[in-house]
Amino acid sequence: MPLQSSMLTLQVIRDGLRYILGGGLRLPQGHLPPAHHTVPEDFFGVGVASNVDSATDVYIIAQLRILGIRQVRLDLSYDDLIGFQGRFCDALLEAGFAVTLRLIPPFESARQMHTVEEQAHWQAFINTVLARFGARVRQIEIGNTLNRKRWAGYTWAGYYAAWQMAYEAATQRNIPLLAANIQDFEPLYNVHLLKTLRAKQQLPDVQSNNLFVERTDEPERFDHRILKYRWAILFKFNLVKKARLLQKIGRDFGINNTVSTGAFWAIYRIERKLMYGAQKQADYLTRYFTLLAASGTLKQAFWGTLVCHREGLINDGLEDAEYPALERIAHYQRADGELENYQPYPSFAAMQTVVQKLSGAQYIGAIATTGGLEIHDFLQGGLHVHVAWAINGKAVPLGDVYTKETLAAASFQHRDGADFVDETPDLICETPMYLTWPLGFKVEMVEKPALTLPLSIDAHMPATRYFAITLEGWRGLVAVRNQAEAEQLMQALDPKQLAPLDKASSLRYARNVIWMVPHPLNVDEQITVKKPVKMYWHKVLLDRYRPSKARRSWNGAMELLRRGIASPRPIAFFEKIGDNSLKRNYYICEFAQVDCHIGQVFGAFAAGEASFMGLERETVYAQLARFIHKMHHNGCYFRDLSGGNILVKIIDKTNLEFSLIDTARARFSDYGIPMHQRLADLTRACHKLDWPARRRFLGHYLGLSGRQLQRHHKIPFYLYDTKVWLKRRVGRKGIKKLRQKLTSLFS
């Protein structure tokens, strides 16, 4: 029998499309979690493995007890029965854990499962496993990322042969069976599999799926990979809808229960775009499991691996180069590394807390969901428990969501279980928090909660807390270490008393005035204050319903920083409520200690200089190209990337650090920006360069994404050059120059 090249066969497509066109995926309001259901007591689980050191068995069992998790998934293959995984399985069962045993043939054996020889090996393996563990395990799963042939190795014929043998053996012993560990949300495979097994009268007891949403970055997002970005909001395939649809598919084919036997966020993938990967993994874990608990669809949900430096709850101390060739979601073969190097990630405490808070809880309903703000109401242990968070980078003041009386009566717990005792939080942000009240207390909301005025923060900025300010018609935010510093800062930088310096004493005085003041918290430092002083009439009309310039500057800087793009650290912003002039707002940030800006560097190169301050042309081009490419890859369209806004700190002649200022116009995406926006930024950045220099610079930039400079790439540069030429001659600058020339002539 020839081996099939892919699991996505014509029959899979036909079965799936027939189901979809028949309305199988129709689920009105399926993206919203249904109210009033109970989260199973044994809802939470994790994948485990051990190694040759039996002390690892003891360690992992101890960590599972700390987590409060009794449900584990363990992978077994042919050689494991006489190895450490078999020993570890016995230890888990003796310790009272409910084990889901995933049986996995070696890759080459799975590829040849259609042959009589391999079927005999598989049958012997099944019989041995069931004789040794069968009566003690909770359930057995057959299939490992079945729809990923390069990981599992199966053909459909081979899998159905393996399933039939396992089905007959397990049915004789009354052992529940799971099938077939489909990876991600790819319902064509679920439909084809269950349709085929129903026809064979071999349906599993439980449908299993690895319900990953890592590809959408955040657990709450609508999946942009289903019919792409512009349709994501229309079809609303978020995590809740995916879970509900998987349950529906199972029930349509006669299976009542569905489980997710593995999912995670790999830290290294998070850090491709965001800072603080381990902290973000912990955020995502809490948000993911809360949404699955709210969906009311899954019988169980497992985190992929307990011990792994990439995706585990515990860091094994290894480097990426030491990661096994086969993905651990396909086969978690062993806990690698040395026991003395194991260290819990923040996600460990996050898992411990969500297990404690939500196991067996009653889900009351969603107070806010799918709009960037998530608040979910549970009853647990005689308490109202609200799990609250915002999407990445966004924040909303608690006072805009709950009444003062409700907040005064609340107890607050961090994502990791620590109590907020001395200083309660001011904001709901991307890091989930738990708010609890006694069961009889009436929780009152200010209004229907939502993200109204845009507010961005870098939630994991070290040694930083955010305090919302409301003071005599002013509002804003300060970023300091504690409440005492916030009060000290407000005394020194009261917006009612902040006054800009005159033109001669300012760093800049044009549409905005920028000046320095002593840092209220550090007498040895200066900070920068920025305030609009001139608004053209059309801007007053167009910007009336936009956030203030100070808020936009704050948001832009915060979005850059959390993406790993340097900008002077924001300290505060203040805005006058109801200000029609649009000029009564202040943005305050650290003063940037730099050596020059790119406008000066490129100006020198354009004048024919071979170097500037000891910097060679190619060094500057290559390093600036990497900086801007990273910014674009991480989702920033800066829109004002002129040379004066790119600051340069010279570490040495071959090592430069760049940072960005004037951040109010920047726009941000969760994904890399398209080429036309990249070119729009680049036209401003290298406007001063002549075309030979531009070609060198653009060669570096485009080469980072495997491209070469083409003719159509040059068009935006010609258009921008023309725009600048016209602006200098017939625009505001041209008119100003003409007026000055006429004045001097007649005087």
What are the language-model segments listed below?
Residues 157-288:
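Noncatalytic carbohydrate-binding groove/subsite architecture in carbohydrate-active enzymes
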Residues 41-81, 87-91, 98-102:
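Catalytic domains of carbohydrate-active enzymes, especially glycoside hydrolases
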Residues 15, 20, 420-462:
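C-terminal beta-strand-rich structural cap/linker in extracellular carbohydrate-active enzymes
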Residues 656-739:
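C-lobe/activation-segment region of protein kinase-like
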Residues 469, 474-599, 610, 626-634, ...:
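Conserved ATP-binding subdomain of kinase catalytic cores across diverse folds
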Residues 263-351, 365-371:
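Aromatic/acidic polysaccharide-binding cleft in carbohydrate-active enzymes
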Residues 641, 646-651:
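Hydrophobic residue at the +6 position relative to the catalytic HRD Asp in the kinase catalytic loop
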Residues 368-407:
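Carbohydrate-binding surface patches
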